[in-house]
């Protein structure tokens, strides 16, 4: 079974950017230009729901920054391909100096007592790797200074503050401890201007960290790092981050204003271009199951991670049937199964993923609202609506025909599948489809990917 949910590996970041899978390349370009425009140490928060693709967005920005910096370690072929995917102004293309980047996964370092330690370590290690090898002496001094800072900030030296107060010259010792800020300032100044005129530090997953870690990291960054050449970009879910802050300070605490101390600007993560995404997932066709799947993604406002998981499950569950000649059936019971596979199964998978209580009510015959919502879009439901009609039925006023509304028809189909034992207690013919007391079980098994319809090789 293929996992469509990609990790932000170097290869995946490069391929998704070059193919513009999420449709955000233009947003990446504008964000890059925004970063270039700042002439002070700004902190920007990119706000997005969990699973919306924030990590991929910041990695795409980092990729473009590296491509635009001629002193980065990107090979020329990759650099040219990346730049060709965005329409850069000529004035920006010709700049000789640019930005260098650091990526810090806060959640991976969540167990650190002093967040600034792991942050300084990541800055030192990543910048030493990303800057070209001819700056050998500078690298050594840079890393040595980073080591000195880490030593000064370590728990051992912090505990030594107590010993300092007991020494013969306590003020001199405290003065040495407070030189950390100067050393950190020197640390960033050692990045030669011909290599990069700015350092952009991307901090990801902060909203998933323990409250104490989150607070300490924000406070320590503000306290220790104040250099006009250093910028911070936080990719977070602001709502979740505010909840984290309130867990530390209390529910009555104004977490929104507190975060304003650290974030100069807040930006909402641009939405994905779903058309590009559906093409990538193989859902861009006019097969009815693809239309239904796209519609369901829109109805439940699925984020990138939710869509990849959902679409992968639908493909595995039904594509062997829906995208082959097997779907051309002549017997009513077969037509009923094909209808279930194309419509009911994708809906069951979505409900189970998104809302367990709605799923339970739906399969237990208590709530047909999800089916009604699915067909509230008139354009996409006309064809299937006709499929349900008997010879004597019509969706319009016609002589010798019985008019039946869409809602009435959908209710009949829903009851035939999920309330068959209560409403009918026998086989039911609706249009060209036949449903019986085993249709519900068939639908649930298909949605669980545990029938012959499933294809685990997809």
Regions found by a protein language model. Give the residues of each.
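The catalytic "switch" region of P-loop NTPases
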Residues: 1-20, 24-28, 64, 171-174, ...
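Walker A/P-loop-proximal flanking segment of P-loop NTPase domains
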Residues: 1-91, 432-458
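Catalytic acidic motif of RecA-like/P-loop NTPases
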Residues: 47, 51, 204-215, 222
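Conserved AAA+ ATPase small/helical "lid" subdomain
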Residues: 83, 135-155, 264-341
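Charge-biased C-terminal accessory regions appended to nucleic-acid-, cytoskeletal NTPase
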Residues: 378-458
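Short hydrophobic/aromatic beta-strand immediately N-terminal to the Walker A/P-loop
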Residues: 43-47, 103, 202
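P-loop NTPase nucleotide-binding core
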Residues: 52-190, 424-427
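Alpha-helical lid/collar subdomain of P-loop NTPases
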Residues: 316-400
């Amino acid at each position: 079974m293929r996992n469509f949910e990609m990790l932000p590996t170097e290869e995946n970041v490069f391929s998704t950017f070059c193919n513009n899978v999420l449709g955000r390349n233009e947003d990446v370009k504008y964000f890059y230009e925004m970063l270039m425009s700042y002439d002070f140490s700004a902190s920007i928060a990119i706000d997005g729901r969990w699973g919306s693709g924030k990590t991929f967005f910041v990695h795409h920005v980092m990729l473009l920054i590296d491509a635009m910096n001629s002193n980065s370690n990107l090979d020329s072929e990759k650099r040219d391909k990346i730049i060709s995917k965005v329409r850069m102004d000529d004035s920006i293309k010709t700049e000789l100096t640019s930005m260098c980047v650091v990526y810090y996964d806060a959640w991976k370092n969540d167990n650190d007592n002093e967040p600034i330690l792991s942050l300084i370590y990541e800055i030192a290690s990543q910048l030493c790797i990303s800057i070209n090898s001819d700056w050998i002496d500078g690298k050594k001094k840079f890393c040595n200074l980073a080591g000195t800072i880490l030593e000064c900030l370590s728990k051992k030296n912090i505990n030594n503050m107590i010993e300092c107060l007991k020494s013969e010259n306590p003020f001199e010792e405290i003065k040495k401890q407070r030189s950390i800020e100067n050393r950190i300032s020197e640390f960033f100044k050692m990045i030669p201007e011909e290599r990069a005129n700015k350092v952009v530090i991307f901090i990801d997953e902060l909203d998933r960290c323990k409250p104490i870690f989150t607070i300490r990291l924000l406070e320590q960054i503000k306290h220790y790092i104040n250099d006009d050449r250093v910028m911070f970009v936080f990719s977070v879910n602001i709502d979740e981050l505010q909840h984290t802050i309130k867990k530390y300070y209390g529910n009555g605490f104004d977490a929104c204003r507190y975060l304003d101390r650290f974030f100069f600007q807040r930006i909402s993560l641009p939405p994905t271009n779903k058309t590009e995404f559906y093409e990538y997932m193989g859902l861009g066709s006019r097969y009815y199951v693809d239309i239904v799947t796209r519609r369901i993604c829109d109805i439940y406002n699925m984020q990138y991670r939710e869509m990849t998981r959902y679409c992968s499950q639908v493909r595995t569950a039904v594509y062997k049937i829906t995208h082959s000649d097997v779907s051309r059936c002549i017997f009513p019971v077969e037509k009923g199964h094909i209808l279930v596979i194309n419509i009911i199964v994708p809906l069951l998978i979505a409900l189970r993923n998104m809302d367990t209580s709605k799923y339970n009510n739906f399969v237990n015959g208590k709530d047909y609202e999800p089916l009604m919502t699915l067909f509230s879009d008139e354009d996409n439901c006309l064809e299937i609506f006709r499929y349900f009609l008997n010879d004597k039925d019509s969706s319009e006023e016609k002589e010798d025909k019985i008019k039946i509304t869409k809602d009435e028809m959908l209710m009949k189909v829903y009851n035939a599948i999920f309330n068959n034992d209560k409403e009918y207690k026998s086989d039911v013919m609706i249009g060209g489809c036949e449903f019986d007391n085993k249709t519900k079980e068939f639908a649930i098994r298909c949605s669980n990917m545990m029938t012959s319809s499933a294809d685990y090789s997809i």
